[in-house]
Amino acid sequence: MRASSILPQSGYMVFADEILEISDGYASCAFSVKEDSPFTENGELGSYAYMEIMAQCIGVYSGYRNDGEARLGFLLGVRNLDISRASLKVDERVITTARQSVSDGEGLYIFDCEIRCGDEHIASATLSVMNPNDEMLKSING
């Protein structure tokens, strides 16, 4: 399944191509670096994109939990960020996993995420995110 079908991002802002696996508390997505992306420079995508790649894997999980509906989410914090490689090359395919470790039942979640290219660890981090319900979104938007 195409990840873009349940993500709020579109076009060049999508950093998850395909949903590989999704279950209760877990998502796995594939992403290939595009040569024509405005974020690709000299044939590489820098490590600055890694947190967004991880966050979009969480976004895929959120969309799955909301019956395929793309929902707005907020990245609140990143802990234990470990980057093993400074960039990804054009056409490299990475696999991102997101495993939920905490949920408060009100829209606050913590996920342990990892990006791998084959057997190589690229990056990992613990992301705190908020997936607001409709009532909370209305109060945010005024």
Model-derived segments and spans:
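Beta-strand-rich interaction surfaces with strong enrichment in secreted/lumenal proteins
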Residues: 4, 16-18, 83-87
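Catalytic strand-loop segment that frames the active site of acyl-thioester-processing enzymes
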Residues: 10-46
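Short aromatic-glycine motifs in intrinsically disordered, low-complexity regions
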Residues: 1-10
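Hydrophobic beta-strand-centered segment that forms part of the acyl-chain substrate-binding groove
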Residues: 60-97
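Conserved positions in beta-strands of structured domains
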Residues: 20, 84, 99-101, 116
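Compact, glycine-rich, soluble single-domain proteins
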Residues: 42-60, 75-76
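Hydrophobic core residues within well-ordered beta-strands of beta-rich domains
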Residues: 13-15, 94, 109
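HotDog/MaoC-like acyl-thioester-processing domains
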Residues: 89-90, 101-142
